[in-house]
């Protein structure tokens, strides 16, 4: 039998207690309250991060509308609460100043040009209600406006006269700006945008001249669109403008679309840029006036200068109505492409100087030479602010003053020559 080696007392001996684990909780005494369960610790809130994961510190943003509790009148407060974002612009205009000196009078012609442009838009919209841009109906629609529409004759006359006055004001504004050297640094782009506005305005005059579809306008357009043919690529452009080899009903519709759609849109864009530059850059005094003490003070642009500008607008409107009533433009007779051209065909007065130069250059290649001279002269005139380095340094530049006088003399003398030949002494 195998020997039993186990200790008989081994089954009854108590087991030794295990040593306590450091940090372990002790058992609660009998009857003692159970300790509260420890809530799990919340993780720390992550720092504010952008969607890309870049940390951005919190920003204390002010009330987006600090004027909502304004104590102004009810109407003013209502508008101020909704258009408060414009307040910085209004404050800027309140602090904007215009220098006063003996030549300040010339500052108002730019505003008059803008006023007559607004008149053009308003009267043009009224005329559009009745005008029909077709070869068969254009002239008769003018007769209807003139004779049947209430005050239609007055609207047409105001539209015609405001177009001429607008161009006249722009010429005066351009030359007064030139001789005061207001184009100098940093106003170069102000001059360039003004020159572009003048060119677009002349385009208004050229495209609107044909719209009555009378005999004089028809043959003047025929002659005027012949001139660019001598230039390289000119024949192609003329055919696009005319809608064919000759002036026809297609030409009328194309002139109409240019006059009421394309040119107004371009003028609005350039005019917005021009007026913005005027506000940002301010009004310039002639060279040396500040140093010589010739500036008598400054007018607040708002409301003082604008109030004076408004007085000029009222005077301009009175002159416009007087001319429209006392010196009405005639309608003439309906255009007949098969009839011979009448005696004394000429463009509008603002093209007379160029028209006279074309007449003077009757030799072979003369028309092309005249076009080249017009183009070079226009480019040089537009780039004057960049060419006149002395004016940019606040120094007088007599050479450019002489250049401006020569240009003005060319325009005035040739304009008078056409007036003398075609108005005063036109053979009957």
Swiss-Prot record:
Biased composition (Low complexity): 21-51
PROSITE patterns the record matches: CYTB_CTER, CYTB_NTER
Region entry Disordered, spans: 1-67
SUPFAM superfamilies in the cross-refs: a domain/subunit of cytochrome bc1 complex (Ubiquinol-cytochrome c reductase), Transmembrane di-heme cytochromes
Chain sites annotated for binding heme b b562: 159, 259
Membrane-crossing residue ranges in chain numbering: 108-128, 160-180, 191-211, 258-278, 310-329, 367-387, 399-419
Gene Ontology biological process: respiratory electron transport chain
Cofactors: heme b
CDD domains on file: Cytochrome_b_N
UniProt topology in membrane: Multi-pass membrane protein
Binding site for heme b b566: 173, 274
GO terms for MF: electron transfer activity; metal ion binding; oxidoreductase activity
Domain of life: Bacteria
Cellular compartments annotated: Cell inner membrane
A UniProt-annotated Pfam family: Cytochrome_B
Cofactor note: Binds 2 heme b groups non-covalently.
Note: Heme 1 (or BL or b562) is low-potential and absorbs at about 562 nm, and heme 2 (or BH or b566) is high-potential and absorbs at about 566 nm.
Free-text function comment from the UniProt entry: Component of the green S-bacteria bc complex, which consists of the Rieske protein and cytochrome b subunit but appears to lack a cytochrome c1-equivalent. This complex has a comparatively low redox potential.
Record-stated family: Belongs to the cytochrome b family.
PANTHER family: CYTOCHROME B
Name used for this protein in its record: Cytochrome bc complex cytochrome b subunit
Gene from which the chain derives: petB
